Amino acid sequence: MKIIVILGINADIGSNLGNLFINDGYKVIGTYRKKKPTNIPKADIYKCDITKKKDIEKFVSTLKKKKIKWDIIFSSVGTSEPISKFFDTNFDIWRKSVNVNFISQLEVIHFLYKLRSGNKNSIILLAGGGTNNPFTNYSAYCVSKIALIKMCELIDDEYKNLNTFIIGPGFTKTKTHLETIKAGKKAGKNYLRVKKFLKSSNQGTSFKKIYECILWGIKESRKVTGGRNFSVVHDKWGTNRLKINLLNDTGKYKLRRFKN
C-alpha cells in the first residue's frame, strides 16, 4: 500500500484529495494546525503546526517510530492573508504569511526526506494567483507561490530520485476565499470577483480534476513533470502531444526569462 502525507489535510483541497486517495487504496497521513477535520475518518491525522519546529520534530519522530515511509507528499497548506497593498500591510504579518506559504512547508519536507520509501518518490505543491500577472494586494501569497515554483525546479535538479512538481488548481470553492471577503475593499477588484464566484452555482475546478492532474504527474515520472508548474485548468496535461513537447524542452513550464 502506497503512503501519501498531506500537509494541511484540514484544508478543503487537502481533505477532498485525501478521501480520493483513500478510495484508490492509498494510506493517507495528514497534518492539521487548529481544528481536526472530521470529514476524512479513514486517514491517520496528527496535530502539527508547521510553523513550529517542535511540532515538526514530534510529527516526524512519530512517523519514524511507527516505521512509516512515504511515497508521496502533497502540501495543501496556505493563506492568502495579509490582503492589502504592500506598504499598508503589517510587515510582521506579511513575514508570517511567507513563512506559512513557503518556508515552513519546505522545512517539513526537509525533515521528511529521510523517511521516503525508496528511489521513486513524488512531492507535489500548490501554485496560485500571480504566476502570469500581478496579483494586486496579495503580495505575500503571490511571492511565496513564485518561490515554491522555483524551489520545485531546484529540488528536481538536485535530486534525481524525486519527482517534484507544482500545480495551479485554478478557481476552486474553498474556505480560503473567505479571507478575501473578510478583507473587503483591501482586496481591490478581486473582492467583487470572489464574491460573485461564491454566490454563483459555479463550483470552479473540481477536486476530482485536481486529483487526476496529480495522478498524471506522478505516473509520467520526473522526465516529463519534474520541476515544472502545471495549470490544472489551462494545460493539456494527459495528452501525448504535451508529453512529447515536455521531453523535448527542459525549460518548458518553468520560470524563464529566455524566449519571453
Regions found by a protein language model. Name each.
Residues 41-54:
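Rossmann-fold cofactor-recognition segment
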Residues 109-110, 153:
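A short, exposed helix-loop element centered on a Lys and neighboring polar residues
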Residues 57, 78-95, 137:
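Conserved mid-core segment of classical short-chain dehydrogenase/reductases
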Residues 122-160, 168-174, 178-184:
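Catalytic loop of short-chain dehydrogenase/reductase
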Residues 6-7, 75-78, 121-128, 163-168, ...:
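Structural signature of the Rossmann-like NAD(P)-dependent dehydrogenase/reductase core
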Residues 10, 14, 18:
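N-terminal Rossmann NAD(P)H-binding glycine-rich loop of SDR-like oxidoreductase domains
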Residues 166, 186-259:
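C-terminal helical subdomain
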